[in-house]
């Protein structure tokens, strides 16, 4: 698992939200009530039964909805994020996970205290007003909150620094550059994401993720500005 956590493509698979990866990952996920309701609507054409009542058709229907898709992916992604934070060599990152879990515990206590009800019906109101919309239990409520905070922090860490640079003859430079150098198509292959000038523990990992994100963007969006760039792909059609 630790080796996978260091592979940028592993994180792109999880963070990309692609339908194929979502279907695979959803096998490990626990859908919330709202996710299930997106599939099982008696008055909706999304409802399935009879000859068409298969798990595959239900999953396919659910994953067509962006919000439901995110909820299916969230559970396995949270496990990966927790493992990355917990096993990180940067002690500030491992401490962030501990602090965040403590914060989530405190948040739960606060929101439970704010639920208005008669003392004898407290647990019922907590279930209906708080937990049912977040997976149905205290554990799923906390997992959702933990995921929201970890994914936000992880994304900010990945893009906190700009690793874009120019590498020629083994030498890496962050600029400034002459226009004539950058404007030549033949030099575009020298544009890289490199952490050679950044000494912190996770810089190389973050630089590789930025590089993968850029490659995915260039491959799938066919941006006009780089329509003739070959890099490691052929020119887009």
Curated annotation (Swiss-Prot):
Protein topology in the membrane: Lipid-anchor; GPI-anchor
Family: Belongs to the MG307/MG309/MG338 family.
Protein name: Uncharacterized lipoprotein MPN_439
Main location: membrane
Domain of life according to the entry: Bacteria
Signal peptide range in chain numbering: 1-27
One GO CC term, this protein: side of membrane
């Amino acid at each position: 698992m630790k080796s996978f956590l260091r592979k940028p493509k592993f994180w792109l698979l999880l963070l990309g939200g692609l339908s194929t990866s979502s279907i695979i990952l959803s096998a490990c996920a626990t859908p919330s009530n709202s996710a299930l309701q997106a599939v099982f609507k008696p008055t909706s054409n999304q409802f399935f039964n009879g000859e068409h009542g298969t798990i595959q058709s239900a999953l396919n229907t659910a994953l067509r909805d962006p919000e439901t898709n995110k909820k299916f992916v969230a559970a396995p992604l949270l496990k990966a994020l927790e493992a990355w934070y917990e096993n990180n060599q940067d002690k500030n990152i491992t401490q962030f996970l501990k602090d965040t879990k403590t914060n989530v515990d405190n948040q739960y206590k606060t929101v439970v205290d704010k639920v208005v009800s008669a003392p004898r019906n407290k647990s019922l109101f907590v279930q209906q007003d708080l937990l049912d919309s977040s997976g149905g239990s205290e554990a799923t409520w906390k997992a959702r909150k933990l995921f929201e905070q970890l994914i936000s922090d992880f994304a900010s860490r990945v893009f906190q620094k700009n690793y874009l640079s120019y590498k020629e003859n083994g030498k890496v430079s962050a600029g400034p550059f002459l226009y004539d150098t950058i404007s030549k198509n033949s030099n575009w292959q020298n544009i890289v994401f490199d952490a050679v000038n950044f000494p912190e523990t996770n810089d190389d990992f973050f630089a590789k993720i930025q590089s993968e994100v850029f490659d995915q963007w260039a491959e799938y969006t066919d941006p006009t500005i780089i329509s003739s760039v070959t890099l490691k792909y052929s020119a887009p059609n």
